[in-house]
From Swiss-Prot:
ATP binds at residues 241-249, 263. InterPro entries: Blk_SH2, Kinase-like_dom_sf, Non-receptor_tyrosine_kinases, Prot_kinase_dom, Protein_kinase_ATP_BS, Ser-Thr/Tyr_kinase_cat_dom, SH2, SH2_dom_sf. It comes from the Eukaryota. This is Tyrosine-protein kinase Blk.
Length: 499
């Protein structure tokens, strides 16, 4: 275990179609096109784009039309592409003859690896590990992806069970001059499909016999850009998830078919204008590690609608039976995901101001996203807390406690406390100390000691660096993301040896 040389590497400053047999896949679709790209509302044209070559694709997944200009398709349905501009393609179904728009990442050419349920073309090594380590994937679950380091080559990633717990092992798939493939030179295959078929019958030197392709949950439905302010009757509140400083949070449904989280304003704690300001900040910040904002109801009681995260907040999850059994590498990877989201906030010249485990949400696949931007603000250089504003003392940097001045460096301090929450499986920071005692102790240079469950390298090289007294001496989130992602790779080989 240890750190790579990330400190030196990262700045502190931060065609024609013919009938074929289609094998459709069961894995979940990739994310739908972003909110900012919703130009597919232009009326469908009855004629094909003159510059568009005649092209036929197959639907990789079901797509339910959201608007009357969309084309509803079923997995395996063949389509003719009429226009392929941007993230939305105009297509005609060869089954129904209807025309409309479909997300471009929901279709693929009829003769392509994309129709194989085990093929994840552009997924990174790190995300491949995260997906394979999800609870629904068992030992032997696998995927094939394009190599990040060798363009045109492929890698096989397999979930394994060792004495250290669940791990993912990676194998290089090498190409032959005649177009074949191999992992071990003693046996070659004409296609990737043949390679998968062989290692699915027997492991033949791999860590596990290949069992099932890596699975994902169904994707979230598209949310159209023009559905920002929505009618209250389009929402159904089903189950109360909790309450906070600004209101309650419910699990519910939009238009009876899309599961969402709905945050309601608690009257008297925040003006409608401030609540809508929170929503507008969230709307401008879009990243895969940030909980996504979908819409708002602007008439009181005001609602804010976001994506639903099935496992709830990280603080509560760490205290469950499943959470308490998470290995240290999984905990550090969760920390890296939070740092990735905060690095985006840092690049966007914004701050969070309430970063703690209670405001990190966990998905069904145990991916973490940053939530609750009620206190985040777009800033020039710093945001001064308004008189009377509340903030959690045990997570707050000294300069913010004493002077009410918040910068991204105050978020870095909070991140150090968040790391302590994670490695102690949700223990309250500064156990046994009151808020005034914490303030006095920090003034005299006190810092929480290294827990027994925390590696010294993590505590000395990362956590305590976040707690530097001078804000400018604290690391950037870019740096923190880098060292946390690399924490366990310094002593690991990038690939398994040839079987």
């Amino acid at each position: 275990m240890g750190l790579l040389s990330s400190k030196r590497q990262v700045s502190e400053k931060g065609k024609g179609w013919s009938p074929v047999k289609i094998r459709t896949q069961d894995k979940a679709p990739p994310p739908l096109p972003p909110l900012v790209v919703f130009n597919h509302l232009a009326p469908p044209s009855p004629n094909q784009d003159p510059d568009e070559e005649e092209r036929f694709v197959v639907a990789l997944f079901d797509y339910a039309a959201v608007n009357d200009r969309d084309l509803q398709v079923l997995k395996g349905e063949k389509l003719q592409v009429l226009r392929s501009t941007g993230d939305w393609w105009l297509a005609r179904s060869l089954v129904t003859g209807r025309e409309g728009y479909v997300p471009s990442n929901f279709v693929a050419p009829v003769e392509t690896l994309e129709v194989e349920k085990w093929f994840f073309r552009t997924i990174s090594r790190k995300d491949a590990e995260r997906q394979l380590l999800a609870p629904m994937n068992k030992a032997g679950s696998f995927l094939i992806r394009e190599s990040e380091s060798n363009k045109g080559a492929f890698s096989l990633s397999v979930k394994d069970i060792t004495t250290q717990g669940e791990v993912v092992k990676h194998y290089k798939i090498r190409s032959l001059d005649n177009g074949g493939y191999y992992i071990s030179p003693r046996i070659t295959f004409p296609t990737l499909q043949a390679l998968v078929q062989h290692y699915s019958k027997k492991g033949d030197g791999l860590c596990q016999k290949l069992t099932l392709p890596c699975v994902n949950l169904a994707p979230k439905n598209l949310w159209a850009q023009d559905e920002w302010e929505i009618p209250r009757q389009s929402l159904k509140l089903v189950r109360k998830l909790g309450s906070g400083q600004f209101g309650e949070v419910w699990m519910g449904y939009y238009k009876n078919n899309m599961k969402v989280a709905i945050k309601t304003l608690k009257e008297g704690t925040m003006s409608p204008e401030a609540f809508l300001g929170e929503a507008n900040v969230m709307k401008t910040l879009q990243h895969e590690r940030l909980v996504r904002l979908y819409a708002v109801v602007t008439r009181e009681p005001i609602y804010i609608v976001t994506e639903y995260m099935a496992r709830g907040c990280l603080l509560d999850f760490l205290k469950t039976d499943e959470g308490s059994r998470l290995s240290l590498p999984r905990l550090i990877d969760m920390s890296a995901q939070v740092a990735e989201g905060m690095a985006y906030i840092e690049r966007m010249n914004s701050i969070h101001r309430d970063l703690r485990a209670a405001n990190i949400l966990v998905s069904e696949t145990l991916c973490c996203k940053i939530a609750d931007f009620g206190l985040a603000r777009i800033i020039d250089s710093e945001y001064t807390a308004q008189e009377g504003a509340k903030f959690p003392i045990k997570w707050t940097a000294p300069e913010a406690i004493h002077f009410g001045v918040f910068t991204i460096k105050a978020d870095v301090w909070s991140f150090g406390v968040l790391l302590m929450e994670i490695v102690t499986y949700g223990r309250v920071p500064y156990p046994g100390m009151s808020n005034p005692e914490v303030i006095r102790s920090l003034e005299h240079g006190y810092r929480m000691p290294c827990p027994e469950t925390c590696p010294p390298e993590l505590y000395n090289d990362i956590i305590t660096e976040c707690w530097r007294g001078r804000p400018e001496e604290r690391p950037t989130f870019e740096f923190l993301q880098s060292v946390l992602e690399d924490f366990y790779t310094a002593t690991e080989g990038q690939y398994e040896l040839q079987p």
